[in-house]
Structure formats: C-alpha cells, structure tokens
C-alpha cells in the first residue's frame, strides 16, 4: 500500500463520544443493521436530502488554529476612539484564564437546578448588586443581550406598568446612541407604540405619553442635569428610562437618585473585549414595585430544606417557558458568562479601584480637552465624563481624518463636520500626544499631555457629582489580589455542575462538548480588540469569517441568505417574524397578522409572535405528539385572509420526525402564510435534511446548540436568521454599518453582526468536522438518543416515538404515573439525579410531569451507561415506595439532594443509610459531585424577594425567622 501523507488526526474522532466498537454494540442493542439503517428508520424518506453537503474537507485542529490566525492577521486593530457604547478595556488575565477560558464556567447550563449552581448564582447576584448600587435603584436582573435591546425592554416594561390604555407615546432623546434609537423604534412599531425622537427639553408629557428614554452621558459625551425632565415626566404620570455608562456612575450621580424609573446599559467596559460588537452583558435595573414586570432572569435569595440561605432564579412565572405568550419578554438566553466576567471585574477592582479607573479616564479626557482648547478647537460641551465632541477651527474634518488614518486612529465623524473622541482605561499619554497631532495646532505649537496634566486638577468637578457610596458589600472589598480572586472564583466553580463533571442531558438544549480548538481564537486580540463601527476595510478577517460561515450555514440549511444580528434564538424568532411581516406588507397584505403555533412549541415562540404584534392561535397536537393536521387546516382556513405565519420545530419538541411536515408547510402556503422553523433541533438534521427543501421559508439557528458555541451558564448565544430568496430583501439593517437587504427591517440588535466574536467558534467547528464529520455527528446524535431511549424503556415509558418506533435526537420519559399514584414527581427525580452526579433532563416540558432527554453526539457509551444506571437505581428507589418499604416523604427522592454537611452530621435519622444518600451506585465514588445546598424553597424566595448580595448576618441565620429578618432589615 502506498504511503498516505495526509493527516490521520481527524477531529470527528475527538468530537464523537462512541468508538467504533461502541457504535456496533449500541446498534446491536437496538437491532439495527447499521448506523445508516437506524437513520433511515428514524427520518422519513420524503424529507431526506439527496445532495451531500458541499463544504470544505475537514481540517486538523492545528490547521484550523492556523486558519484563524491568518484571518485575524487581516484585521487592522487600530486605536478606536469612536465610543458609541463600545470601548477598549483591560481584561484582567486572571479573569480571562479562570472564567472566559475555563470550561467549568463556559459549559454550564442556565441555573434552573439551583442546588448544583450556587457558584454561578452567587456571581450573578454580585452582578445584580453591582448594578443596583451603581444605578441607585432597588432591583436588577442578571443580564440582557445588549444595551439597545435592554432599552427596548425598558420601554416595553414601562408601557406594561402604565395603567392608561390610551398612553402609547414614548419619547427618545436624540442624544441616545443611534443604534439604540433604531432598535427601540423597531421594537415599538409592531405593538403600536409611537416613538418620538426629540431633544429632552422639548419632551411634551401629555396624557398619551407613558415614558421617555435618556442617555447619560449623551452619545457625544455631555453630562446633563435631567432632574427637570424627570420631574415633568412624573408630574404627568409618565416614567423615565435611562441608558447609562456604568463606569461613569462611579463619579456621576446615580440615575435612580435623580428620578429614573429604569436604568439600562452595557457592562462591556468592565473587562469584556469589544469583539466587533459582542457578546457583552447588558444590565437592567428598576424600581421594586415593578419586580414582576422585569424581563429576563433574576437571581434571588431563599432558604433550603434545612433553613440555610441559598440562591435561585426568582419569579420564574414571568418568563416565557411558563407564561408563553403572556410573558414579560421572549428572552431566554441572555449573557451570563459575560455578566460573570463583569461582576468579577468589579469584585477584583472594588469600589476604590473602579473610581480610580474612572477618575483616570476622566483626567485623560480633561487633559485632551485642555489641549484641544489651546490648539484653537472648541469642545462643544463644558461638562463631560470621557467623551468629547470637537468643533474644528482652521481644519476640516477631512484633514483630521487623513491625519488620524495616518496614525491608525479611528474617530467618530459627525455629519455637521464635528469630530468625536471617546477615551477609555487603555489610553495613555502617548495616545493623547498622537491625538494632538491628529487635530493639529493652529499656532504651530507642539503639545504634550504630560505637560498639560501638570497644570490641571485631578478629579471630576462637573455637574451631577456622585455623593453616595457603592459596592460596600464584603464581596467587593475582599478579593483584590490575584491569589484571593483566583481562590474565590475556584470556590464558586466548585459549586456548579458543568460538562467537566458529567453529561448534561437537557432536551432541546443540545449540551454537546465544545471543542477547545474552536474556542481558542476568541482570545486573539486581533479579533477581540476590534470596534464594531470601525471602517469595514479594517475588518477583512472578520468579513472572511462571516462570509465563509454564511456560506457554510446556507449550504447546510438550503436557504439563500443569512443575518447574524440576532443575539439569541428568541431574538432570531422575533427577527424572522418581522421579516415575514415586512414581506406581507411589501405585497400589500398588511392585514396578515395571525400566527399559528403548536401547543408543543417552545415558550419563546408565542412570546416572540406577540412581540411582533401578531395574534397567536394555538394548534393542537394529536395523541402521537404530532401537529394535528385537521386542526391546522381548520385554523388556516378560518384565518386564510389574515394568516401571516406558522411556527414549527423540527424534529418536533416531542422528539420525533413528523412524517407530514411537508404537508404542514403546504397547508400554510395554500393560505398565503409563511413557514417559520424554530432551529432548536437542527442538530438532528445537519447533512441529513435541509429545512428549505421540505418547505420552510425562514428559520433561525442556535449556534450555541448545534454549532458548538458553549452555553456559558445562560449565554452568550447567537440566533442567526436564514431566509429563502423571496424574504432576503428584508433581512435587518443597521443605522451605522450598511448591512441587510434592500428593503431591510430595522436593526434588532446594537451591533450589525451581533456577537461577532463568537462566530469564530461555529466557523472553526464546521472546519474541524467538514461535511462527513458534520453528517456523522447528526447520525451519532440519533444513535445516542435511540440507545438511551431503548435502555431506559426497561424502567420508564417513552411518551412519543416516531416512524418505525424510533426517536429523533431527544425523547421524553414519562413520570406522570408516579405523581398520581405515589406523589413522586419529576422534580424529585431531578433532585435525586444530583446525588448521582447528573444534571436533570428538561423538566415538565413540553409535557407536564415528564423529563426530556437529549444526550448529543459527543457523549460516550460509557457516559450514557452511567446515566442509565442512575435512572435504573432511581427506579428501584421509586419501587421501594411502591411496595410500601418506604413512605414517599421519607424516601431518598423527597429528601434529595444530599449535601456533604448533611451526610456527615453527627445525627442521622433517615430511613436509609448515609451511603445510600451519598453513594447510591459504585460509579459515583469515582467522581463524586456534592450539591452545596439542600432543596431550595422557591415559594419562600418569591414571597421574600431579595435580589442583591445579602447582609453578612443572613449567612449566619439558622432559622427561617432569622433569615427573613436579616433580609428585611438590609
């Protein structure tokens, strides 16, 4: 045989869990002749694609890293003083290495299972406390997608809390960032809110006005005293929202103190790279009386079964997974990993450190202003924090721009000929000297920053100075050395179960392992350091990645075009529905406003449709879990003139490939509607079927599911929208960077390409696997799910099966009989799984009283068997209750989870042994994960809502009364 010089180190062998021998054993257990035979049995022939993926061949890990390095070298990372909500920042290496690059943090899931997420919950509580302190308000959430969408959420919240049915006008200051203005206007239009962009002094708070939005400081840097605006708004029963620079609030009066009812903004400059637009965590704070209207996740303090303090996600009944179309927002994924980074930045620097950073940035700005004044230019605003708008004298904007480009400096250029300069913590005296040269001296003198600074007083002395303290909690005043912070972060990580411990079999979440080689490029400063509004010629590397990834994903899905602007799957849904609306309007069919949504759909679907101004009609499912075709036809016929869209998920959320999906699409098209596919389950389709081929018009993809961007404990995510050719003209645009179709809908996110930095991960993932590896991944995902379903069916019923008695990439375990007969429910099983070292599958969705299991392709047979053993042992524990050996309340299931403190206590009065509690099967001994709190009390936490860092005496409380008292007096 001839020598083969090609590399044998293909990545699919690293990514796929089962070995060839494992595959054979699993197929044998399933009675399947081959992997292809299993796939053929699971997927209807009618939707299988006949065309293999036309993608580049797989590369090795080193080849992908080299390709990423080459692409990064094409970016020009100039010094960007553009501002507009994005700044250079120093990411402390201790945070970069121990949070951003640490799989114990980035592979976690959203902390629904609080007992095994106390570390992440504490980090997010720190984030909320930081937000509350700096904004001067009472409550905050645990992050939103970006500043612009947070401002839109604030508008919607204030509209909800306003009791006047005819109040539908919202003022937006013309001094807000342009991307914020556009996103707010775009969000308002579908739901009938009239946005008026105006100067704040001209706001007219009539009876039809429910609120306004201000920027603090303004987009061009001015610090205004807005107390009069707030007073006028409140006198008219209107509300005030403020988009504030978080670092500036260490020096400026907190908006909550001068009348703001909601404050939003970005935490990007708290140690998170710009990344050509994201991802970054937005913050959201408001008044306590609006607590049940807050969008997104909130972390709150509660107690556990022993009365000890614990943390959990609070007020979940606000959210889309419970309230569906009546939710406060469609938000699901947020920006948890970035919120953790920002909170650790505040913990690391503390209040004094943050004030020092802000003061230094302001001093640099003051020095720049002095120099510009001496050169004859005029700084437009007397009061500023770190941004100047310069009216030029004896120089044109073109001349300044030419000199700036010669020095590789980006500035902001206004239409009126003025120039903007926004400084940040990375600026030094040499940067100021370069800026003096760029602006030029009218009298020929050369200026030096150090000389100017010697004659100036340090500190902020403008209007609205901050008088109140902030970040006084011990957590912000204890970990300022690298050693202390490292240990603190490690102590939190140790409390959280992630993929470094075991598989996370969450249905519809696709918790696959994330290739390290795919994540490595995001730390490259040539990608991380780029401003999203830098000239496009400076972003050639990004343009290459975006263009190539666009081609890969359209090839995989069969669509024609794509936009990466949506920062989450829910945002992608909303975008797709707006595109459908724009399409109907362009055809003169504005009356089409009905959206058909199956009852099995993700909660984000009806929530997104409502946000898009559509009327949601729910379609029944039949006894097999499929969309009820008769009901679909009936509703489509009854609403034929108004039908805008139907939203489907494929494979269905019931874990099967419905055989009549093409017929569903045909019915909708016959009545003039468009078909939207929720791409949450595309991991079962890549290389096997293409959504466009079976009739879908538009879909979103979850790059944080199928294409291996890690979940980060609840974000970041990317939800790009893929469109058929007839919908492509309506892809979202952007007010600053040209993008989208020629009839584009407004921007739906702050940055033109959304969270561009992490697109690198999916780009690298596809390159690593190539067409054969991607297809094999889908097949292996089906194999793993069918093997698990087969093994678990010996102990539990599987609710739905598809063609030939097979499931798709996920399936539903039925626990309902145990609830009705034994008072043992899905939550009891979920908590007991923690003692076995596993995160629970998805609970009570899409069928109440069940668990939905998705193993993904990256789990080995050994890991699948560990999960089977755990479920089998739990079934035996249930049987002990069935036979009367134990009462349900005395069983391991009702008492779970068991902490180390509990099982090592001097007294043990349980009806089972300590060993049964802690080490129920032998495999647990090899890698025991200990929950750090007992079962949390959700009801107590919601009754006694507390969303900030608790006082020190709360940690010492032994009884419920002591904890309640400590929280109420804080």
Residue ranges of predicted features:
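Active-site region of PLP-dependent enzymes
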Residues: 303-338, 736-759
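General small-molecule cofactor/ligand-binding pocket signal
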Residues: 140, 194-198, 380, 412, ...
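Conserved PLP-enzyme active-site core in the AAT-like
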Residues: 119, 149-310, 372-376, 389-390, ...
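Conserved phosphate/anionic-ligand binding catalytic regions in large, soluble enzymes, centered on
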Residues: 272-285, 289-290, 334-338, 422, ...
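Non-catalytic terminal extensions of PLP-dependent enzymes
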Residues: 1-29, 41-81, 90-106, 112-115, ...
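A conserved hydrophobic secondary-structure block that centers on an alpha-helix together
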Residues: 130-151, 165-166, 170
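N-terminal export/assembly segments and adjacent metallocofactor-ligating motifs
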Residues: 110-120, 126-128, 141, 145
């Amino acid at each position: 045989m001839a020598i083969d010089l090609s590399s044998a180190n293909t990545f699919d062998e690293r990514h796929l869990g089962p070995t060839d021998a494992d595959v054979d054993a699993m197929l044998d257990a399933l009675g399947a002749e081959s992997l292809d035979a299993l796939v053929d049995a699971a997927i209807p022939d009618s939707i299988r694609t006949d065309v293999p993926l036309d993608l580049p061949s797989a590369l090795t890990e080193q080849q992908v890293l080299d390709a990423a390095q080459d692409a990064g070298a094409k970016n020009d990372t100039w010094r960007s003083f553009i501002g507009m909500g994005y700044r250079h920042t120093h990411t402390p290496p201790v945070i970069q290495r121990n949070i951003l690059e640490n799989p114990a943090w980035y592979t976690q899931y959203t902390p629904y299972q609080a007992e095994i997420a106390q570390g992440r919950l504490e980090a997010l509580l720190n984030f909320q406390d930081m937000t509350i302190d700096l904004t001067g308000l009472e409550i905050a959430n645990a992050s939103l997608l970006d500043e612009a969408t947070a401002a839109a959420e604030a508008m919607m919240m204030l509209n909800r809390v306003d009791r006047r049915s005819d109040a539908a006008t919202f003022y937006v200051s013309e001094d807000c960032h342009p991307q914020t203005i556009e996103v707010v206007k775009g969000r308002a239009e579908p739901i009938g809110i009239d946005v008026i962009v105006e100067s704040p002094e001209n706001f007219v708070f009539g009876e039809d006005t429910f609120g306004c939005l201000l920027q603090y400081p303004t987009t061009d840097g001015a610090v205004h005293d807005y107390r009069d605006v707030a007073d006028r708004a409140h006198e008219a029963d209107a509300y005030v929202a403020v988009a504030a620079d978080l670092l500036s609030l260490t020096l400026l009066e907190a908006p909550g103190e001068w009348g703001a009812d909601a404050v939003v903004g970005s935490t990007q400059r708290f140690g998170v790279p710009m990344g050509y637009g994201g991802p970054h965590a937005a913050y959201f704070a408001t008044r306590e009386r609006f607590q049940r209207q807050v969008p997104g996740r909130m972390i709150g303090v509660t107690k556990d079964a022993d009365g000890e303090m614990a943390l959990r996600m609070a007020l979940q009944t606000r959210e889309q997974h419970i309230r569906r179309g009546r939710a406060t927002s469609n938000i699901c994924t947020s920006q948890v990993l970035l919120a953790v980074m920002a909170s650790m930045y505040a913990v690391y620097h503390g209040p004094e450190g943050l004030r020092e950073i802000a003061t230094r940035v302001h001093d640099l700005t003051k020095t720049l202003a002095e120099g510009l004044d001496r050169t004859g230019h005029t700084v437009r605003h007397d009061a500023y924090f770190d941004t100047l708008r310069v009216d030029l004298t004896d120089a044109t904007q073109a001349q300044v721009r030419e000199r700036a480009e010669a020095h590789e400096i980006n500035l902001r250029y206004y239409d009126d000929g003025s120039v903007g300069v926004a400084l940040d913590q990375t600026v030094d005296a040499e940067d100021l000297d370069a800026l003096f040269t760029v602006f030029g001296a009218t009298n020929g003198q050369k200026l030096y920053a150090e000389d100017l600074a010697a004659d100036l007083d340090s500190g902020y002395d403008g209007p609205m100075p901050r008088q109140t303290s902030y970040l006084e909690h011990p957590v912000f005043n204890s970990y300022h050395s690298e050693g202390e912070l490292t240990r603190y972060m490690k102590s939190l990580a140790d409390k959280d179960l992630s993929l470094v411990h075991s598989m996370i079999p969450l249905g519809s979440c696709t918790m696959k392992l994330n290739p390290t080689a795919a994540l490595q490029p995001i730390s490259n400063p040539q990608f991380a350091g780029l401003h999203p509004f830098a000239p496009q010629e400076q972003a050639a590397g990004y343009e290459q990645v975006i263009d190539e990834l666009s081609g890969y994903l359209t090839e995989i899905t069969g669509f024609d075009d794509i936009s990466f602007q949506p920062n989450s799957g829910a945002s992608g849904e909303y975008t797709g529905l707006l595109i459908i609306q724009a399409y109907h309007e362009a055809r003169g069919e504005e009356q089409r406003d009905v959206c058909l949504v199956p009852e099995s759909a993700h909660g984000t679907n009806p929530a997104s449709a409502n946000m898009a101004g559509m009327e949601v009609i729910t379609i029944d499912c039949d006894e097999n879990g499929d969309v009820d075709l008769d009901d679909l036809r009936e509703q489509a016929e009854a609403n034929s003139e108004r039908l805008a869209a139907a939203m489907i998920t494929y494979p269905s959320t019931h874990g099967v490939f419905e055989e009549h999906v093409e017929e569903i699409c045909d019915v909708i098209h016959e009545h003039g509607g468009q078909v939207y596919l929720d791409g949450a389950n595309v991991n079962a389709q890549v290389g096997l079927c293409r959504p466009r081929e079976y009739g879908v018009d538009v879909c979103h993809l979850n790059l944080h599911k199928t294409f291996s961007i890690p979940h980060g404990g609840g974000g970041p995510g990317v939800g790009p929208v893929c469109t058929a050719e007839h919908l492509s003209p309506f892809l979202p645009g952007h007010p600053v960077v040209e993008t989208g179709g020629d009839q584009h809908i407004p921007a739906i996110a702050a940055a033109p390409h959304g969270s561009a930095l992490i697109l690198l991960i999916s780009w690298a993932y596809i390159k690593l696997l190539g067409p054969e590896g991607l297809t094999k991944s889908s097949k292996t995902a089906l194999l793993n799910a069918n093997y698990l379903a087969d093994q678990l069916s010996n102990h539990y019923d599987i609710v739905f099966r598809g063609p030939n008695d097979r499931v798709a990439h996920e399936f539903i375990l039925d626990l309902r009989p145990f609830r009705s007969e034994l008072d043992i429910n899905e939550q009891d099983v979920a908590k007991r799984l923690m003692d076995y070292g596993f995160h629970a599958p998805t609970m009570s969705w899409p069928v109440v009283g069940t668990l939905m299991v998705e193993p993904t392709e990256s789990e080995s047979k050994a890991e699948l068997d560990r999960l089977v053993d755990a479920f089998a042992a739990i079934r035996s524990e249930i049987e002990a209750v069935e036979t009367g050996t134990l009462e349900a309340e005395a069983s391991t299931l009702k008492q779970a989870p068991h902490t180390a403190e509990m099982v090592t206590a001097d007294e043990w009065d349980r009806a089972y042994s300590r060993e049964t509690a802690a080490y129920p099967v032998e495999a647990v001994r090899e890698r025991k994960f200990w929950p750090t709190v007992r079962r949390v009390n959700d009801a107590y936490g919601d009754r006694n809502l507390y969303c900030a860092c608790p006082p020190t005496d709360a940690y010492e409380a032994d009884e419920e009364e002591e904890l309640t008292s400590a929280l109420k007096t804080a």
